[in-house]
Amino acid sequence: MWTGLGPAVTLALVLVVAWATELKPTAPPIFTGRPFVVAWDVPTQDCGPRHKMPLDPKDMKAFDVQASPNEGFVNQNITIFYRDRLGMYPHFNSVGRSVHGGVPQNGSLWVHLEMLKGHVEHYIRTQEPAGLAVIDWEDWRPVWVRNWQDKDVYRRLSRQLVASHHPDWPPERIVKEAQYEFEFAARQFMLETLRFVKAFRPRHLWGFYLFPDCYNHDYVQNWETYTGRCPDVEVSRNDQLSWLWAESTALFPSVYLEETLASSTHGRNFVSFRVQEALRVADVHHANHALPVYVFTRPTYSRGLTGLSEMDLISTIGESAALGAAGVILWGDAGFTTSNETCRRLKDYLTRSLVPYVVNVSWAAQYCSWAQCHGHGRCVRRDPNAHTFLHLSASSFRLVPSHAPDEPRLRPEGELSWADRNHLQTHFRCQCYLGWGGEQCQWDRRRAAGGASGAWAGSHLTGLLAVAVLAFTWTS
């Protein structure tokens, strides 16, 4: 049937099949240009002057980005806007007092937007260079039903507001109206905030911390049967936030591990499905590209200063890299640097465990990008649930001391063997950066399009199919 096809048909069909099976392209990496970024966002600058225990500068060079979440640091590559640093975010404080109206429908969006410029300008003072900008609003959630436990105050006060305006309404009508008013106002606050800050600092990648969430914490109640999978209802609720994903330019899920999950398969599953859900959202809610995903994690377990085990470094940083995240952000608060002892423990952990692993996985992701994707994409695990990672092969590489002043303490020595390349090709595929295509990101679509901006193959697919059909008609 197909033997009589001419070269035009053959080429068109090859392009259609190849482009249709590719992953959507994503934004090229920022900062160092590495396919997988590891950022350090812990206020460890106090360890030297205050506690006489500075961290090793050579260790810190293992991180692509260094920042601090503390108030006094501005113009950083990573900026986190907590609720008191960006506009007038309506919420209830820790003692239940209303701040800026309490519930979003009681806040002033206009006044909030008026204040944004000054706040953004204070923390991000220049347009260049590009960076990550994370809005951390955790007091309420824009989906009504997700405001459970201590967040139920937002539903309760929303119902009271409606009841005060309509005392004759039945309870079910009050609830329905309260939900509508809350969700509409929450959406407006989040959307208009994103639109403003994106227009004001367009080179930064903007999104909300902990969005999307997976709500897969049921290991506490169901340890024996825990799978880590996101409940179907929560996946559906994430899809209700399509308006948020459409306006975001990056996603920032969180995979903080409780010590209950330490060195367990449950810990890996908890992380894996949260990252997979973020990558799903990043992919399905944009027609022509996938949003970059930067995963927040901690160098220690939640609510403590015990460093992650080797297994859990793999389950957090390694799993994120293998699944195709753009990077991880290692976050910590002032509790990491309260004394000489806490700084010493952190310094020892960095030298002994964290830095060697970060160097390993960062370079493994880079070598895979070079070998598999021509340096124009990142490697993504073919089977998301497979137990395979982007690690340097012990038979081909070793980490050796680096004496160059501008390099990390350790660097890889060796090269990929044919067995390494076969392993990568078997277990990983490429996700190309915008403007590149092909199974190995070998096609420069910008050049093929005559200088037009690089868009995903999906935008060309209809045209290619038309070419194929037309050419087949000519040869029939």
From Swiss-Prot:
Ranges of residues in domain EGF-like: 364-442
Reaction catalyzed: Random hydrolysis of (1->4)-linkages between N-acetyl-beta-D-glucosamine and D-glucuronate residues in hyaluronate
Glycosylation sites per record: N77, N106, N340, N360
EC number: 3.2.1.35
Disulfides per UniProt: C47-C343, C214-C230, C368-C379, C373-C430, C432-C441
Signal peptide: 1-20
Single GO BP term: multicellular organismal-level iron ion homeostasis
Keywords: Cell membrane, Disulfide bond, EGF-like domain, Glycoprotein, Glycosidase, GPI-anchor, Host-virus interaction, Hydrolase, Lipoprotein, Membrane, Receptor, Signal
Catalytic-site annotation from UniProt: E138
Family: Belongs to the glycosyl hydrolase 56 family.
Other comment: Acts as a receptor for the Jaagsiekte sheep retrovirus (JSRV), which induces ovine pulmonary adenocarcinoma. A possible mechanism is that binding to JSRV envelope proteins may liberate the oncogenic factor MST1R that is normally negatively regulated by HYAL2, leading to oncogenic transformation.
Function, in words: Catalyzes hyaluronan degradation into small fragments that are endocytosed and degraded in lysosomes by HYAL1 and exoglycosidases. Essential for the breakdown of extracellular matrix hyaluronan.
Protein name (record): Hyaluronidase-2
Gene from which this protein is expressed: HYAL2
